Regions:
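Alpha-helical, largely C-terminal catalytic domains
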Residues: 1-399
Length: 399
């Protein structure tokens, strides 16, 4: 499903403005909200496993998040209170229309994916705990946004009702371990605040673009593309989850250093390595202390050498090839990550950001050079069985 129609549909979420009936600062897009939600989901799920011994299906957590993202991308112009009431009364009919719209707007969408999506939405007891965690993550991401705009809207009709609705929904999720912890504004809450700042770091900051995208939205798109690549490679569930989470967290250090563009990193010999060492030190000092110690190894695994093909054997990181991962390590216990495929998704995301803006007639020298260089780099290129060259060929050259 790594096709032009699907990728363009994902980027539609970068156009959708949230809270547009409220006084608000800029930067609240549906894409960013969905990315923040998935990072919060990770925190909730890990705490639920650690504190309550929950047996969670991480692949279903990720797929559920993708299903809900696609659904909201079709329906999100509907005001939240109206949306939830419509789903309560006409949920089956609305979802049937969503499936129809997805098939119309993404002609090459895979039928087995659609069948899983229908199962997810039409059977309430299917993966009930995973749905509960995603629902809590949704309201926590919404609450994070609303707290930022609340003081702009105090006294405006309806703002107190909105606040009460969000708080009541979260109260219904207090049986989840992390929801209580987050309400106390402890370390986990500070982590969610910190990663939330990725919403405000703009990509291609030196150039005007439409749509504007943030580092936060970018990482979710890389994660989703990484998920579909892993499925195409026939990856086991653990490998699929690893590729998604690595895509989701690969730019986490940039919340501390900001998005240092590749030409700057390459401008001085050794500068790229220096930046990496600085990022590692700052992650250790600023991010890891906000998370339980038992999570540190995984966070470092997702953020260090993020684009290397690797597995973990007896607690040690071993660098390898995608071919060897597929033949020897495509099973639980090795925590395989297809780093070079994720690098391909990362570059594809950068390319599409520029291509979309130039299609709308907004361009710059930086964007023209960037689009040309990335397209040339991936001409006829296949990575681990993923034909990235074919994907680029679907995007026509803009003169």
């Amino acid at each position: 499903m790594l096709t032009k129609s699907f990728i363009e549909f994902l980027y539609d979420a970068a156009h959708i403005q949230r809270w547009n009936e409220h006084i608000r600062p800029s930067g609240f897009t549906e894409l960013d909200k969905q990315a923040h939600k998935m990072m919060i989901m990770y925190v909730l799920a890990r705490h639920e496993e650690d504190d309550h011994g929950a047996q969670l299906n991480w692949r279903l957590l990720i797929e559920g998040g993708i299903f809900e993202f696609l659904q909201r991308n079709v329906l999100t112009d509907i005001k939240p209170q109206i949306f939830h009431e419509m789903m309560r009364v006409y949920g089956k009919e609305l979802n049937a229309w969503v499936y129809q719209e997805l098939r119309r707007r993404i002609p090459d969408i895979q039928e087995d994916f659609m069948e899983k999506m229908q199962l997810y939405f039409e059977y309430p007891q299917y993966c009930a705990m995973e749905k509960k965690i995603l629902r809590a993550a949704h309201y926590l991401a919404t609450k994070w946004e609303f707290e930022l705009i609340y003081h702009f809207n105090e006294g405006i009709y309806g703002s107190e009702d909105t606040k009460a609705v969000i708080e009541n929904e979260l109260e219904d999720h207090y049986d989840l371990a992390a929801v209580k912890k987050l309400a106390l504004k402890g370390k986990s809450s500070k982590f969610i605040d910190l990663v939330g700042q990725l919403r405000f770091q703009k990509r291609w900051a030196q150039s005007p673009r439409v749509p504007e995208t943030s580092v936060m939205g970018h990482v979710l798109l890389v994660a989703i593309m990484g998920y579909f690549c892993a499925v195409k490679l026939g990856a086991c569930d653990e490998r699929i989850v690893g590729d998604f989470l690595c895509g989701l967290f690969h730019d986490l250090p940039e919340v501390l250093t900001r998005d240092i563009i590749s030409p700057v990193k390459r401008s001085v010999p050794g500068l790229d390595e220096l930046i990496k060492r600085m990022e590692e030190r700052m992650v250790a000092e600023k991010i890891l202390p906000l998370l339980p110690y038992t999570w540190h190894e995984d966070i470092l695994y997702y953020t260090q050498d993020e684009f290397s093909n690797r597995v973990r054997i007896d607690g040690k990181v071993v660098h390898t090839s995608i071919e060897e991962i597929s033949s020897k390590y495509n099973k639980p216990g090795f925590h395989a990550i297809d780093g070079s495929v994720l690098k391909g998704c990362d570059n594809l995301s950068a390319f599409v950001e520029v291509w979309l803006s130039r299609r709308y007639g907004i361009t710059s020298k930086h964007m023209e050079e960037g689009e040309r260089a990335i397209r040339e780099q991936y001409k006829n290129k296949i990575i681990g069985g993923i034909d990235f060259g074919r994907v680029y060929d679907e995007f026509p050259i803009i003169d």
